[in-house]
Amino acid sequence: MTADNDTRDWTEKYRPVSLADIVGNDAAVKALRQWAETFGTGKKAVILYGGPGVGKTSAALALAHDMGWDYIELNASDVRTKDAINRIAGPAAMAGTFEGTGGRRLVILDEADNLHGNYDRGGEAAIINVIRNASQPVILIANDMYAMSKPLRESALQIQFRAILSTSVAKVLRKVCANEGLKCDPEALMKIAERTNDLRSAINDLQAAAQGSGQVTVADVSTGDRDVPETIFKVMGMIFRGKNMREALNATYGLDENPEDLIGWVDENLPREYQDDDLERGFEALSRADVYLGRTRRRQDYGMWRYAGFMMVCGVNRARRRHYGGFSRYSPPTYWQKLGRAKSTRVTRDSIAAKVGKACHCSKAEARSTYLPLLRFLFDKDEYAIRLSAQLKLEEDEIAFLLDAKKASKKVGEIYKKSRALIEEEIEEEIDLFARFGKRPGKPEAGEPRESLFMAGEEEEKPSREKSAKLDAFGEIEKPKRKRRKAPDGGAPIEDGPEEPGEAPMAAAMPAATESFGPAGAPAPQESPLPEPEKPPAAEDKCSKKQRTLFDF
């Protein structure tokens, strides 16, 4: 490949395509290839860890190329919240390829050791869940593996990528110069390789030196040295065992740690390095540093950080009077872990309280104070624990909190598994009920024999009048006609004939119109009409019509 019109960054332009192009980490490449070829028999995920620019991301992409796998990558520019991981990485790790050919899809998560900020809250737990349920290979890339939680480290195979030798870096730089048509001084290339700690930085420095010219000389690369960031472990060694306190103090300026964090590291590892009087003097200097930090917080005067840094570095360094041999493994402050565990416990407790409050129609505070102790008591019986876990849809960490047990314990796993099975059964019952909804019980399906709508032993009862009824031309019941005859006194004709079934004749039911209620031969007395009640005059109505309406109930 030549320069020509290709304006890409050289680190991307010369990124290795195959695993065979990865330099300086043959053992790591071999282990990575073996994991891919035997996928399905061991760990579902692998952690590639090491310093920046040693080929971790390039090895992951080259592996996908060599194995013929699709890949999806989440890097530092992506949002790594719990929801984002479950939405993107989760389906990608469980589904097939985009083409549906049945091949593998590689899920790559870069900077997996930086899932500790507020914006990535819940991301690490989501990654563990993705790995547990994955059917596709997953690669996690990290600079500091020990910044990741222990459950996450144990869920994956660990492969370390070491720093590349300067001779190997210079060899790659010579190939880049040849492809770009540059005249490069071998001494200049070696100088670039020695002053950088990684291949990516070396290629960037080479591109910067060759900008605007067709050659790279020693003068071009001697204009300045690259600032190399120090690691906290190296600085700890310089503080406790270094002979030059000025070098140790200058090394802290390259740390990505503030004095509030650095004093925690020194306080945690000081008893592992010093003994007796040296330990006493070291803690005395450390206490003076803490005084300055307290004044900084109270007065908001961050100029006092320099005094705190001087006491925690130079003061501790000069407290040593004798030499201590052996190897000491430095560790981060344990109170960070305690704070993390306490915070995780509070989050789990509040999550359970929110679910209980929703089910019991009460506030989260009331559920936390009233119902959580009752739940702990009920969870002593497995039957109640399973049913309550299914009803509240509790996760494993929530079940472990109520049982006061570890999340990885056998009992927690069994209760979680049985509760999920119970939830699935209820869902299936709801689906069956919904499928039967809307069907008429008396209407037979296609191909089924038609049955009566009435239960066995019941007979259809119809009104007796409908038994003898006839229908007219409009489909209505035709009433029987009555015969008309003349009255004996020449009055109005009288209807006679069949009555409705069950009806007595009209003449038998009512007295005759000419029947007398008085003595024989005397005419019936005439009743005088009752006088109608007089209406009150309008003047006496003291309430208006509107008022009468209001009080008229």
Curated annotation (Swiss-Prot):
Keywords: ATP-binding, DNA replication, Nucleotide-binding. Residues 438-553 are annotated as: Disordered. GO terms for biological process: DNA replication. ATP binds at residues 50-57. Residues 442-451, 532-553 have a biased composition (Basic and acidic residues). InterPro entries: AAA+_ATPase (IPR003593), ATPase_AAA_core (IPR003959), P-loop_NTPase (IPR027417), Rep_factor-C_lsu (IPR023935), RFC_lid (IPR047854). Disulfide bonds: none annotated. GO terms for molecular function: ATP binding; ATP hydrolysis activity; DNA clamp loader activity. It comes from the Archaea. The keyword Transit peptide does not apply. The keyword Zinc does not apply. It holds the Pfam family RCF1-5-like_lid. Residues 503-513 have a biased composition (Low complexity). SMART domains: AAA (SM00382). HAMAP family: RfcL. Belongs to the activator 1 small subunits family. RfcL subfamily. Heteromultimer composed of small subunits (RfcS) and large subunits (RfcL). Part of the RFC clamp loader complex which loads the PCNA sliding clamp onto DNA. This is Replication factor C large subunit. The lineage of its organism: Archaea, Methanobacteriati, Methanobacteriota, Stenosarchaea group, Methanomicrobia.
